[in-house]
């Protein structure tokens, strides 16, 4: 029948594109709460009655995709609810029934876009935890004013334009306000004078001046925010850590005013010039991620100890510049492209931790020169993943080295990695090698080695040298071409796991 294929195709399409049936209502106890989806029906009421006595912290209910009648029914039946979570309830239009729950201590509301009036929460003065994330909330926060016992505050709305109404909470240490566009930060500062940690993620902030009055502020996050000028924060005496990840700003140079800051965590911005870091005497941790920086020389004039370069939008260039950072202790190269002169890192005399992760010059370019390690007399751990390397045989006797991990090394070049140099490290206790072709393991012996992990490793001809390691207690091998005979003759205390 010539129409059979067409008929079958139409039937298949009908099945694929037919509207899916709504999920059936459900209710069950999960951990420390009762979860209810789709409806508060008689079954849900029965489940709560049967399970509530088993909840050690009182009745806590999680609601998903319920309507006004459902919320009213629940609150009428159980006025002793201690905690409530309301999520994904697009049909819900009113929170009025919550006003009856006088024993509530925790409220978590999100995705209730049809709810615009949050005043029913005003009478819940026993609340200690409040989380409201919904764009249905607009204007100010005056409905919050009576809630003076809060210990956790997390508020989010794209339509929030004023922080007026935040209750007086002098003992509150941490608070989060997201997506808001407040014209004035003064109400926040006045009500929460002793904050040590503040998240203003995705907010639009024209003037940061009021934040300088937060005398105890230690951490500040502007993740995804729009910030006109960072310099007012120079007057915040205890500010040590600042997150400006994905911030929109035309004035990153104003970060140079923050002489007191010790940690700057950024990325995914339009940052191209970091000359301002040279003026930050207390800066210890600095990250650059997916940015346009081409000149890293200002870092040589800093006291930065922890530095990460991650997936930059321009070639990284000469690593010898990084090698001139006098105080650098921890260096992480993450998805680095266009890097040259890795041997120039040999001058990092204070380096304690070195990591290459994900890839190194994957799109082409120089292999990483392991001759650089010879100058790292303080390094304790080395981890290299997804990089081609050269001069592995030049690895020196690193006196403080304790851990080495090699993963997917030389997969592009196909070259063998000579690991014998690591055996010269007198304190090496853990060696991990995954997905590599190696040489030098047959004579690998170091006095402090305790564990060795090998997975998908080729080139192993013998493990005889390991028998001379007095502290060795575990060998784990997976998918390696090693004969069983090579695993014989070890001390009884050595636990050998083979998969």
Name each model-derived stretch.
Residues 7-15:
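Bacterial N-terminal signal peptides
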Residues 33-42, 57-68, 73-76, 80-93, ...:
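Concave beta-strand-loop units of leucine-rich repeat
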Residues 47-51, 75, 166:
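Short amphipathic alpha-helix with an adjacent loop that forms part of the alpha/beta core around
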Residues 1-5:
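Positively charged n-region of N-terminal signal peptides that target proteins for export
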Residues 24-30:
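Cleaved targeting-peptide boundary
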Residues 14-22:
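C-terminal segment of classical bacterial N-terminal signal peptides
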